[in-house]
């Protein structure tokens, strides 16, 4: 099982799309290399931070409303379909990114997975 876990980590680090996981409170717990390329933050800078790190201030209330609803229902409104949205780069520059969201159910709690480009 440990070997499969290591393989999964290597795959996530090498895919071309940004992959970000956040726990139930919105704290970033997984940040791959493509996330660094897209948003400018290293994994060390992003891990442990709120996902607000990459969400423009004017979109945060809507984000948290959708996030809380998804965590309560165990499913996202878009059901994994990609959507075009705004995000923030480390430099402060606003980006248009295509994102999709999924709830990943674990043994004890669920996490939110973002995939973006």
Could you tell me what each predicted segment is?
Residues 16-17, 82-83, 100:
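Short loop/turn microsegments at loop-to-beta-strand junctions
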């Amino acid at each position: 099982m440990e070997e499969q876990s290591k393989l999964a980590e290597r795959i996530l680090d090498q895919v071309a799309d940004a992959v970000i996981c956040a726990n139930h409170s919105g704290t970033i717990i997984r940040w791959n290399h493509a996330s660094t390329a897209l948003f400018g933050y290293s994994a060390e800078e992003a891990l442990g931070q709120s996902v607000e790190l990459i969400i423009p201030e004017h979109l945060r209330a809507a984000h948290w409303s959708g996030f809380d609803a998804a965590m309560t229902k165990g499913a996202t409104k878009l059901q994994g379909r990609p959507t075009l949205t705004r995000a923030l780069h480390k430099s402060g520059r606003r980006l248009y990114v295509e994102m999709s969201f999924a709830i990943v159910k674990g043994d004890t709690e669920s996490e939110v997975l973002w995939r973006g480009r």
